[in-house]
Design a protein with these regions (language model features):
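Surface-exposed coil/turn segments at beta-strand junctions on protein surfaces, enriched
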Residues: 49, 73, 101, 109-111
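Catalytic cores of secreted or luminal carbohydrate-active enzymes
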Residues: 8-57, 61
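Generic recognition of long tandem-repeat/solenoid scaffolds
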Residues: 67-70, 105-109
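Short, small-residue-biased leader/transition segments that mark boundaries at the very start
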Residues: 1-6
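Surface-exposed beta-strand/loop patches in extracellular or lumenal glycoproteins
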Residues: 69-85
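Short, well-ordered beta-strand segments enriched in hydrophobic/aromatic residues
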Residues: 56-58, 65-72
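Tight coil/turn sites that cap or link beta-strands
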Residues: 111-115, 121
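Solvent-exposed beta-strand/loop surfaces of large extracellular or lumenal domains
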Residues: 86-108
Length: 122
């Protein structure tokens, strides 16, 4: 072949780096906007995929999370890192669901295919 395949790896790496700035999902925990650039004070991303089979949409304003929507692929316990702020979680009907706090982690049960909305506590 006359074309070097290596430049495409750089493109994939750049895309992965941007994704890691917006969403991390290590150790079974979801971490929203862990390294949001100051140059992006508001925005949204839809259709992100996290480990453990989550689909995630993120919305942010003034450099902070305003809403995250999580759709799990399987029934499971979901863990969200809260960082400095605290979150609430609502189901598809808008009803707040029971969560337990474990340090900076917020844990709650999710059902496959249902949408859960995470918002900052006011």
């Amino acid at each position: 072949s006359l074309h070097d395949a290596l430049p495409i790896y750089g493109n994939f790496g750049g895309t992965a780096a941007v994704l890691e700035m917006l969403l991390q999902s290590y150790r079974g925990e979801l971490h929203f906007l862990p390294a949001l650039p100051a140059a992006w004070p508001q925005g949204r991303c839809r259709g992100l995929r996290a480990r453990a089979g989550y689909a995630v949409d993120l919305h942010w304003e003034e450099g902070a999370l305003s809403r995250a929507e999580i759709v799990p692929a399987t029934d499971r316990n979901c863990t969200v890192l809260q960082g400095a702020g605290k979150f609430t979680v609502a189901d598809e009907t808008g009803a707040e669901i029971a969560c337990r706090e474990e340090g900076h982690r917020l844990c709650f049960e999710v059902k496959a295919g249902r949408t859960y909305t995470v918002t900052p506590k006011v």
